[in-house]
């Protein structure tokens, strides 16, 4: 081991920093470039502030929004026979009276 100058801060010791500058490349060599690159690129850990995603509140006047109005559809009609349902209720009522 080479003797280290005690007056130097630990982060300024020779060999403590890589010879090349960190870059934005995510290749394997650049991910293992230094401890900072490894945590940021290799592990994906970032301790900075999270950026807020900006939302557009109002659409421009000329643009068409995605929520088009639904065309009006006629109300669905009941498929059963209304007269038949009235007769069946009368038959049930007459049967219950006869049973009593």
From Swiss-Prot:
Keywords: Acetylation, Activator, AIDS, Apoptosis, Host cytoplasm, Host nucleus, Host-virus interaction, Inhibition of host innate immune response by virus, Inhibition of host interferon signaling pathway by virus, Interferon antiviral system evasion, Isopeptide bond, Metal-binding, Methylation, Modulation of host chromatin by virus, Modulation of host PP1 activity by virus, Phosphoprotein, RNA-binding, Secreted, Transcription, Transcription regulation, Ubl conjugation, Viral immunoevasion, Zinc
Region feature (Cysteine-rich): 22-37
Chain positions found as Asymmetric dimethylarginine: 52
Region (Disordered) location: 48-100
Marked site: Essential for Tat translocation through the endosomal membrane: 11
Chain residue ranges for the region called Interaction with human CREBBP: 1-24
A biological process from GO: symbiont-mediated suppression of host translation initiation
Cleavable signal peptide: none
UniProt short sequence motif Nuclear localization signal, RNA-binding (TAR), and protein transduction, positions renumbered to this chain: 49-57
Region annotated Core, chain positions: 38-48
Position(s), cross-link Glycyl lysine isopeptide (Lys-Gly) (interchain with G-Cter in ubiquitin): 72
GO cellular component assignments: extracellular region; host cell cytoplasm; host cell nucleolus
Gene Ontology MF, one: trans-activation response element binding
Region of interest called Transactivation, as start-end residue ranges on this chain: 1-48
UniProt binding sites for Zn(2+) 1: 22, 33-34, 37
Modified how: Asymmetrical arginine methylation by host PRMT6 seems to diminish the transactivation capacity of Tat and affects the interaction with host CCNT1.
Biased composition (Basic residues): 48-58
Biased composition (Basic and acidic residues): 80-100
Major site of localization recorded for this protein: host cell
Domain notes: The cell attachment site mediates the interaction with ITGAV/ITGB3 and ITGA5/ITGB1 integrins, leading to vascular cell migration and invasion. This interaction also provides endothelial cells with the adhesion signal they require to grow in response to mitogens. The Cys-rich region may bind 2 zinc ions. This region is involved in binding to KAT5.
Subunit structure: Interacts with host CCNT1. Associates with the P-TEFb complex composed at least of Tat, P-TEFb (CDK9 and CCNT1), TAR RNA, RNA Pol II. Recruits the HATs CREBBP, TAF1/TFIID, EP300, PCAF and GCN5L2. Interacts with host KAT5/Tip60; this interaction targets the latter to degradation. Interacts with the host deacetylase SIRT1. Interacts with host capping enzyme RNGTT; this interaction stimulates RNGTT. Binds to host KDR, and to the host integrins ITGAV/ITGB3 and ITGA5/ITGB1. Interacts with host KPNB1/importin beta-1 without previous binding to KPNA1/importin alpha-1. Interacts with EIF2AK2.
Homology family: Belongs to the lentiviruses Tat family.
Protein name: Protein Tat
Organism: Simian immunodeficiency virus (isolate CPZ GAB1)
Gene designation: tat
């Amino acid at each position: 081991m080479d003797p280290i100058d005690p007056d130097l801060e630990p982060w300024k010791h020779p060999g403590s920093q890589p010879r090349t500058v960190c870059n934005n490349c995510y290749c394997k060599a650049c991910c293992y470039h230094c401890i900072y690159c490894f945590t940021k690129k290799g592990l994906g850990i970032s301790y900075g502030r999270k950026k807020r995603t900006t939302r557009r509140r109002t659409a421009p006047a000329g643009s068409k929004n995605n929520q088009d109005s639904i065309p009006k559809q006629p109300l669905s009609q009941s498929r059963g026979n209304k007269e038949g349902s009235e007769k069946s209720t009368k038959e049930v009522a007459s049967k219950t009276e006869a049973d009593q």
